[in-house]
């Protein structure tokens, strides 16, 4: 039996499907992307228009045997763009079915710089070509280039061959870098410098891992193998993790100075495994089910897959053996974008125990049916997620320090009319007695970080404290697994201190809001 992963709520797992055999050419389909069996090439189906500039889900993308392994295909202004580096606007996108091409206009308003990227099907490959009607602006010469990014987790440890020279993608970020004067740094988001140069007035610039005109990526892994060649431009391979933990491997060609017309051309040929069909993706409750509730699994299928008429429920017995306890028919739900969906109702399974779903040769991981499955679902959030986000506190867990006491030096008054990155802004008036950039005493108390980083969103803190208060008023959760000492500015996870945790969380947020 094969084990298939669960379908997590809120996650959109993209995958590939195509024709009937490995000899099929890439075609431009009615959904306006190129496809063959096992390969999809998307051309600005997703644009650089999110709230965080470079969100690793834009530009030219490749979905390769069920995994989006490549993205970010665009004219960019640095070797390994970071989150707050400038991204191009895409004022137009033209799909030409007759020519089997998609053309996207790109523009950097800050530099009055326009380009066009044209992707055209050529057999099992696509040509990616960059066109310029005007030469690269002088201030961007040597910086403007065409980039394509590769997901590190899918390639590290795998081989690549550049112009016949064998090499391997590194597991860790270990390539070479240089530093350059800040005066040579291309402008970042809204003109801000989003890196810390430690007073050196220099920025870090990664050097390429390899350079050549032809690269075969992952020849040792057919599901990830891609051949890329260029007759007119050097291909330079970089490791974007040298500058950002969420950086990807980057293949890049510099746009030549002083030229117009077609200035860069790549031939990109992703390998396709013969008769590949994406495995079924079986969705069910990860929490489990109470005996009396409806129980319906949703099974997501490759459009080339043939739905099975039945699925089964197996129970895991006390001795570790398994037994089929229910078999029922599946029912068609319909198509949604790339996939076909069927449903499997097993509501009549009510006996408490450990179970899994079997669909054809695929089995899921386990789930539990019991009256108490919802009793502890908030414990991980309450015991770990919330306290590790406490600002202005040293947070410890056993032998691990999550973070020291942040922002001990306090905060400065933002200048009027300041539009900072990450949603922070100051209007034309400060409405305080403090001058621009003057230290404001007493602000470095309480509060919680924004999810995933170390800033504070006051609006979010207000919303969360309201939810905490509502939870306390309705349910009075008495769980106490967190030690909080305001005096010591110290938090220790999994250590009771005699006070319900939720009351301490309310106090943290209220203290912060009152100080503001």
Locations of regions flagged by a protein language model:
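C-terminal motif of bacterial Sec signal peptides marking the signal peptidase cleavage site
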Residues: 15-16
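Polysaccharide-binding surfaces and accessory modules of carbohydrate-active proteins
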Residues: 22-33, 131-222
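An acidic-aromatic substrate-binding cleft motif
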Residues: 276-292, 363-459, 463
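Ligand-binding face of N-terminal immunoglobulin V-set domains in extracellular IgSF glycoproteins
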Residues: 280-308, 314-318, 322-372
């Amino acid at each position: 039996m094969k084990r298939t992963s669960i379908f997590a709520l809120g996650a959109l797992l993209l995958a590939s499907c195509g024709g009937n055999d490995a000899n099929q050419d890439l075609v431009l389909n009615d959904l306006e992307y190129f496809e063959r069996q096992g390969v999809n090439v998307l051309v600005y189906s997703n644009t650089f228009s999110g709230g965080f500039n470079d969100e690793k889900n834009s530009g030219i993308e490749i979905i390769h045997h069920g995994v989006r392994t490549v993205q970010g295909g665009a004219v960019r202004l640095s070797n390994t763009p970071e989150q707050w580096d400038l991204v191009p606007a895409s004022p137009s996108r033209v799909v030409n079915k007759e020519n089997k091409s998609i053309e996207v206009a790109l523009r950097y308003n800050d530099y009055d710089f326009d380009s066009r990227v044209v992707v055209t099907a050529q057999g099992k490959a696509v040509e990616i070509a960059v066109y310029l009607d005007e030469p690269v602006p002088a201030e961007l010469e040597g910086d403007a280039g065409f980039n394509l990014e590769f997901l590190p987790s899918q390639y590290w440890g795998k081989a690549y061959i550049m112009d016949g020279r064998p090499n391997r993608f590194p597991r860790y970020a270990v390539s070479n870098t240089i530093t350059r004067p800040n005066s040579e740094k291309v402008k970042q988001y809204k003109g801000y410098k989003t890196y810390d140069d430690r007073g050196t007035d220099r920025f870090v610039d990664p050097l390429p891992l390899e350079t050549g005109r032809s690269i075969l990526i992952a020849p040792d892994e057919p599901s990830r193998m891609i051949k890329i060649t260029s007759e007119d431009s050097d291909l330079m391979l970089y490791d974007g993790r040298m500058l950002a933990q969420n950086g990807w491997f980057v293949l890049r060609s510099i746009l030549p100075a002083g030229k117009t017309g077609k200035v860069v051309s790549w031939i990109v040929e992703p390998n396709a495994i013969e008769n590949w069909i994406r495995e079924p993706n079986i969705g069910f409750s990860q929490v489990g089910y109470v005996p009396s509730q409806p129980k319906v699994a949703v099974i997501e299928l490759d459009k080339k897959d043939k739905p099975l008429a039945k699925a089964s429920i197996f129970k895991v017995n006390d001795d570790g053996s398994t037994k089929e306890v229910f078999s029922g028919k599946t029912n068609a739900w319909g198509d949604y974008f790339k996939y076909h969906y069927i449903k499997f109702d097993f509501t009549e399974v009510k006996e408490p125990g450990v179970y899994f779903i079997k669909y054809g040769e695929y089995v899921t991981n386990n789930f539990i049916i019991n009256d108490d499955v919802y009793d502890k679902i908030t414990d991980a959030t309450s015991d770990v997620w919330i306290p590790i986000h406490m600002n202005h506190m040293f947070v410890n867990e056993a032998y691990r320090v999550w973070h020291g006491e942040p922002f001990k030096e306090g905060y400065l008054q933002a200048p009027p009319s300041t539009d900072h990155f990450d949603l922070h802004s100051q209007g034309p008036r400060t409405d305080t007695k403090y001058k621009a950039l003057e230290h404001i005493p007493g602000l470095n108390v309480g509060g919680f970080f924004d999810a995933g980083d170390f800033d504070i969103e006051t609006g979010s803190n207000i919303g969360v404290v309201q939810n905490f208060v509502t939870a306390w008023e309705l349910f009075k959760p008495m769980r106490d697994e967190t030690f909080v000492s305001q005096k010591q500015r110290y938090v220790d996870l999994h250590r009771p201190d005699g006070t319900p945790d939720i009351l301490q969380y309310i106090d943290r947020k209220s203290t912060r809001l009152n100080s503001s």
